[in-house]
Design a protein with these regions (language model features):
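Residues on the lipid-exposed face of transmembrane beta-strands in outer-membrane beta-barrel proteins
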Residues: 64-66, 75-77, 150-156, 183-189
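Short loop/turn motifs that connect adjacent beta-strands in outer-membrane beta-barrel proteins
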Residues: 63-71, 86, 159, 174, ...
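Residues that define the transmembrane beta-barrel architecture of outer-membrane proteins
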Residues: 69-71, 143-148, 176-183
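Bacterial Sec-dependent N-terminal signal peptides
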Residues: 1-27
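Outer-membrane beta-barrel domain signature
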Residues: 62-64, 137-141, 171-174
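Outer-membrane beta-barrel biogenesis signature
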Residues: 23-120
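Transmembrane beta-strands of outer-membrane beta-barrel pores
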Residues: 79-83, 166-170, 189
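Transmembrane beta-strands of outer-membrane beta-barrel proteins
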Residues: 71-77, 160-164, 183, 197
Length: 197
């Protein structure tokens, strides 16, 4: 079951994110020059994906507000999705306070993030000699960010339910391992409020 889910998850991620693989290689190019600048550029470019992916993982914890009865349970396999905010489709390079790189054209300072439009990023040049240039990667026009998830809910005493969420460990070549889990609790506390039914 774990192998099947691993393959299914990898397949879903590759289907939805296959278009983002090539531009991510360009993030490595940002490492040429100054490491601090590379960190700022990579963070600004990739952060909208991380925020949206995190939001999609935070969705769908329940399908009903009523907790399970004692020892009742449900098992769910789902794909949560989040829509990246339009304000995260670009970022302003001039606000990053880069120390090695500067904008080749100061009037053109907005560049796409990974979730932005598929157009070339701005061109940077080294501040000291103006000989090296770096073209920032284009966006991937991601309208939504998916997250496949396994979830189990289990009923406890006192109208309480514990919910566990799991994304199995996946080894992504050259990037490392990725996994996550989370726990949530639901309680029907209205029984503790006098006169409330």
């Amino acid at each position: 079951m774990r192998k099947l889910f691993k393959k299914l998850t990898l397949s879903l991620m590759l289907c939805f994110l296959s278009t983002t693989l090539y531009p991510q290689e360009l993030v490595v190019e940002m490492l040429s020059g100054n490491l601090d600048d590379a960190e700022k550029l990579a963070k600004a470019y990739l952060e909208p994906f991380g925020k949206s992916f995190g939001t999609s993982l935070n969705n769908g914890w329940y399908t009903t507000a009523k907790p399970h009865k004692l020892f009742g349970f449900d098992f769910t396999i789902m794909a949560a999705m989040a829509v990246p905010p339009s304000g995260d489709k670009t970022f302003d390079v001039s606000k990053l306070n880069l120390s090695y790189w500067e904008l080749q054209d100061p009037a053109n300072k907005l560049t796409p993030s990974v979730t932005g439009d598929k157009k070339d990023g701005v061109v940077l040049t080294d501040k000291e000699y103006n000989t090296a240039t770096l073209t920032l990667p284009q966006g991937e026009n991601l309208d939504f960010i998916p997250a496949p998830i396994i979830q189990l809910g289990f009923g406890l005493p006192l109208h309480t339910e514990v919910v566990g969420r799991f994304f199995p460990k996946i080894d992504i070549e050259d990037l490392g391992d990725f996994s996550l889990w989370g726990i949530g609790i639901k309680n029907e506390f209205k029984e503790f409020i006098p006169g409330f039914k």
